[in-house]
């Protein structure tokens, strides 16, 4: 690791100057169909001539943007890891802001961006990290027949709340809205969830000019389709992969996450369970990497990446969050 900061210490102060700051993009990903996706980059201060030891493509969640990584990215950069965080299609400052492009299209965008990073940094380890919707997108990317060559996936609370895990009233309401008012834009409504215990991070998300506050019904339907696809693809995710989940997640139900984790574990069997790792945080919320205790998952992510770079995927995580993670998640479902 480079620098004097231990993982987690570099983000104790808010990593932005103003709550409503519009930070210019660092550059553009130009994709094969002509789409240009803006990205922010956080680079290590002391970078070797042949590039950083690792590069992370970081994908944000629904209605979020490239700014989703303002808290974790400086910590990764302090550890010598470059973070490249694009606005996904339909979000942030992308050309199709506010409209849904399809989960498969987004998965292929991610694959294309990972290949571009591999070309640009041929001597670096390439990782893909996704939060919430971004994690679901990467689960599809990992199961493409021509999936890009990456060194590992980090999936923080991937969005897996598909129709099969919704009650019939919610499924029926969504079906009716999609067939009657698909273009209507909906606000957050009366129901409030606590996405993180970091109040400043939530205020920043609400004031960020790149955040979308009113969502088209058909975009909601598209995200649910994506979650269905991600849940179905779970047994076939090609590792190495690290799944992160917090006990206080109010957006992705424990039952849905346990279904995915259990399917992955069954697919690989007891003798190959280190290919995909699971970490369960008793104090964590949905936005784990922005939480007050984000130092714990950040330490784990960096340690896991360093283990992969050293040819090991079986080193215990520093926080101990991987100890009996599936069993602890299963036990917590009824609480």
Model-derived features with residue positions:
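Catalytic nucleophile-loop/oxyanion-hole region of alpha/beta-hydrolase
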Residues: 63-68, 91-125, 297
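Catalytic active-site module of serine/aspartate enzymes centered on a nucleophile-bearing elbow/loop
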Residues: 275, 280-335
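Short beta-strand/loop motif that positions the catalytic acidic residue
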Residues: 237, 243-245, 249
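The serine-hydrolase catalytic nucleophile loop
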Residues: 61-74, 255
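Conserved alpha/beta-hydrolase
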Residues: 66, 73-97
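Short beta-strand element of the alpha/beta-hydrolase
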Residues: 51-61
């Amino acid at each position: 690791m480079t620098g004097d900061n231990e993982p987690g210490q570099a983000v104790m102060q808010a990593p932005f100057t103003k709550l409503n700051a519009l930070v210019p993009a660092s550059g553009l990903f130009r994709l094969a169909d002509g789409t240009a996706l803006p990205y922010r980059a956080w680079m290590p201060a002391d970078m070797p001539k042949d590039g950083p030891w690792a590069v992370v493509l970081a994908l944000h969640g629904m209605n979020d943007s490239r700014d989703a990584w303002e808290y974790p990215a400086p910590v990764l950069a302090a550890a010598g890891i470059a973070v490249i965080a694009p606005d996904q299609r339909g979000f942030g400052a992308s050309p199709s802001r506010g409209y849904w492009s399809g989960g498969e299209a987004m998965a292929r965008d991610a694959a294309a961006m990972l290949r571009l990073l591999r070309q640009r940094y041929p001597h670096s380890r390439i990782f893909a990290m996704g939060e919430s919707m971004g994690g679901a997108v990467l689960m599809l990317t990992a199961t493409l027949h021509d999936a890009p060559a990456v060194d590992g996936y980090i999936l923080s609370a991937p969005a897996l709340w598909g129709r099969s895990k919704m009650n019939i009233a919610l499924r029926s309401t969504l079906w009716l809205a999609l067939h009657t008012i698909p273009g209507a834009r909906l606000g957050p409504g009366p129901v409030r969830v606590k996405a993180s215990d970091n109040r400043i991070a939530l205020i920043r998300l609400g004031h960020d000019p790149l955040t979308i506050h009113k969502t088209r019904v058909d975009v909601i339907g598209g995200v649910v389709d994506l979650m269905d696809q991600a849940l179905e693809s779970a047994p076939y995710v090609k590792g190495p992969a690290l799944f992160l989940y917090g006990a206080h997640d109010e957006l992705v139900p424990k039952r849905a996450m346990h279904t995915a984790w259990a399917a992955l574990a069954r697919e690989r069997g007891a003798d190959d369970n280190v290919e995909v790792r699971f970490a369960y945080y008793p104090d964590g919320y949905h936005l784990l990497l922005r939480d007050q205790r984000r130092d714990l998952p950040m330490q784990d992510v960096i340690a896991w990446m360093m283990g992969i770079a050293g040819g090991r995927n079986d080193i215990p995580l520093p926080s101990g969050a991987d100890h009996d993670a599936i069993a602890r998640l299963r036990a917590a479902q009824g609480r």
